[in-house]
Every structure is written in C-alpha cells, then in structure tokens.
Amino acid sequence: MLKLKQQVFEANMDLPRYGLVTFTWGNVSAIDRERGLVVIKPSGVAYETMKADDMVVVDMSGKVVEGEYRPSSDTATHLELYRRYPSLGGIVHTHSTHATAWAQAGLAIPALGTTHADYFFGDIPCTRGLSEEEVQGEYELNTGKVIIETLGNAEPLHTPGIVVYQHGPFAWGKDAHDAVHNAVVMEEVAKMAWIARGINPQLNHIDSFLMNKHFMRKHGPNAYYGQK
C-alpha cells in the first residue's frame, strides 16, 4: 500500500496548493479495487505536518487496517460512493469557496461555457437536503446515499462532481490526482458561473451542440484532444 499511500498523500497536499482548503478542511481518498482497501487522509491532521505514512487504510466496511490515526470523518461517504460506482478510483471533498457557495444556495452549478463542458457533461448537480433523521442517524453514510440518489444511473465520470446542499462539493476521478484535478476545475467553473450570472443574470446555458463537441473531443470514443 506504500505507493497508494504516497499518491493519496500527494493528492491531499495539492488541496492547499490549489487553494481548495482552509486549515484541515477537506480530504482525498483512493481505492485499491483488487484488495478492497481504501487509503484516506487522517481526521484533523494539519497539512503542514502530515506525512505519507499518516494516511489511513480502511476496508470497505470502514475498519482501520493500517495507520495510527482515525480516518477522515467523511470516510463513510467515500466508501458508499466506491461501493456504488466501480469506475471511481479517487474521491475528494473540500469546502472551496465558490463551489460551496452554490451548495449553500441549493443550486446546481450551471454549464455556461466551454471550460465547464471540457470536464462536466451538463450542470454540476446539487443534492436535496438531508432530513433531520438522516443527519441524526448515519450522517456521513446518508450523505453518500443522497449523492447516489441525485446521480442515479448516470456515469459518474461524465459529471465528476456534485455539490451537497448546505454542505459543499465532492469530486471524483480515475485516481486521487484525477479527482483533485476535477475539484480544481469545479471550483473554477463555479467562480466563472457566479461572475457570468452577475454580469448577465439572464444568461442561458451553453448551446447543447457546443457542449457535446467540447466534452466528446476530450472524453468521447473518438476523442482527439491532447496526445496519445
């Protein structure tokens, strides 16, 4: 697990680097599908002092199998998403300012331009609010369940992120670094959408044909963006 712990550590350290977290907010995980183990950031450990060896390894039930610290308080959310979506290799949760503002407003982040369409096929959805019973019960597990409820049977890598109502953004990807990359983009397009709607409150969504072109040229079966 040393390689995966190093990858998860580096991905977690990218969160303050890209301005996505304050203090100890936020966490990144990655999964070893063959072994059924997840590596995740320890709860409440400062980024300035954190080391790769501090990463916590848990099984799919959340039991710690390696590590001296307690895992992130959001571990149950990560595990629920890994169980539901086999294509996910890494997950990140932050409270980045603009994406969290959309979550607090209870609004999806609208697809307004090609920057958004290069990564997200349509609006970045916002979940419903959790009930008092869901919050007082298994809160983190139920957060995962409400994300799944919102995504349904959609391919999660086509819209690799969501905002949880009154909480904040979750993003995911093929691995931990890909998940962080998508979280950075989510924050940027959330900021762009806020600015654009401030300039033009009547601004419509991106044209569907333009969105399709930009997403498919990067992610479709005949993608041609970048190098092979």
UniProtKB/Swiss-Prot annotation:
GO biological process, one term: pentose catabolic process
Record's keyword terms, sorted: Carbohydrate metabolism, Isomerase, Metal-binding, Zinc
EC class (word): isomerase
Binding residues for substrate: G26, N27, S43, G44, S72, S73
Induction pattern: Induced by L-ascorbate. Repressed by UlaR.
UniProt source species: Escherichia coli (strain SE11)
Pfam families, A to Z: Aldolase_II
Alphabetized InterPro entries for the sequence: Aldolase_class_II_sugar_metab, Aldolase_II/adducin_N, Aldolase_II/adducin_N_sf, UlaF
Protein name: L-ribulose-5-phosphate 4-epimerase UlaF
HAMAP family per UniProt: UlaF (MF_01952)
CC cofactor: Zn(2+)
Metal-binding as UniProt keyword: yes
Entry's cofactor comment: Binds 1 zinc ion per subunit.
Record EC number: 5.1.3.4
UniProt keyword Repeat present: no
Family that this chain belongs to: Belongs to the aldolase class II family. AraD/FucA subfamily.
